[in-house]
Amino acid sequence: MLADRFTGSGLPSRLMRRVLAYIALTKPRVIELLLVATIPTMLLADRGHIDIRLILATLFGGWMGAASANTLNCVADADIDKVMKRTAKRPLARDAVPTRNAFVFGVVLGLASFAWLWWQANLLSGALVVATILFYVFVYTLGLKRRTSQNVVWGGAAGCMPALVGWSAVTGTIGWPALALFGVIFFWTPPHTWALAMRYKEDYRAAGVPMLPVVATERTVTKQIVIYTWLTVLTTLALVPATGVIYAAVALVAGAWFLLMAHQLYAGVRRGESVKPLRLFLQSNNYLAVVFCGLAVDSVLGWDTIGSFFG
């Protein structure tokens, strides 16, 4: 293990385990969305130009903000994390970190992210990160998650904020392309999350979390997945006027593939077959990464946008 390797080099294993526990609180894998969304958005906002300093500074500030939100989410969800098999090994669920310490850690990260982004970018970017943290903790985690099956629909708005933060860091405003990218992630979140929840619905049921797969039939859930997948793909195409042909081609091809997977899942359920929703969950990550990577390449090349050909 990582801790063992560090122990061998002279660092106490207890200290290393504590450090790794605090890192785990921030949910590093979830923060990957920050990297996927922020960099291409910033490149689009400053089309044809790369400001490495600003990109790195925004990523660091955004990472602290996301880490803060995830840590405070762990604090609020510690009771249900102990019940669910998928989350039982999280630091607070196994008492690897005192709850009070985790709370202070999360708050400090949030304040630091605001101060950093205000200093390195602008006040709007810092304010957007604070709004994201507050929304994720109070609206989603404490308000919606345990009360409605539509929790991830509205609560997922917090995960869309990297697009707004990235755009505002470059321009100091929130332009319509940033809102379109916000919409892409907003509509992508339900099918992505519901596919996972289909696989772990008994976990959610035991924890008392009314995810859609817990309270609705598989046919209803997969139908909703198809609807939101269509909305996701259509929203990616709405961004085309602000981009070039590379992004347009990637969005079309990747969108067709994503739609095919969603429809296959729905068709399998309709036929009464044993389906594998986790496959859609995993591949939806690849879909989003491909679309945003296509946007990044398109933006770096800086070719004329499709919208410019129409005046």
Curated annotation (Swiss-Prot):
Cell compartments where the protein resides: Cell membrane
Domain of life: Bacteria
Xref: InterPro entries: Protohaem_IX_farnesylTrfase, UbiA_prenyltransferase, UbiA_sf
Membrane disposition: Multi-pass membrane protein
Known catalytic reactions: heme b + (2E,6E)-farnesyl diphosphate + H2O = Fe(II)-heme o + diphosphate
Predominant localisation class: membrane
Keywords for this protein: Cell membrane, Heme biosynthesis, Membrane, Transferase, Transmembrane, Transmembrane helix
TM helices/strands, residue ranges: 19-39, 55-75, 101-121, 123-143, 169-189, 221-241, 242-262, 290-310
Family assignment from sequence similarity: Belongs to the UbiA prenyltransferase family. Protoheme IX farnesyltransferase subfamily.
Remaining remarks: Carbon 2 of the heme B porphyrin ring is defined according to the Fischer nomenclature.
Job of this protein: Converts heme B (protoheme IX) to heme O by substitution of the vinyl group on carbon 2 of heme B porphyrin ring with a hydroxyethyl farnesyl side group.
The name this protein goes by in its record: Protoheme IX farnesyltransferase
Species annotation: Nocardia farcinica (strain IFM 10152)
Lineage of source species: Bacteria, Bacillati, Actinomycetota, Actinomycetes, Mycobacteriales
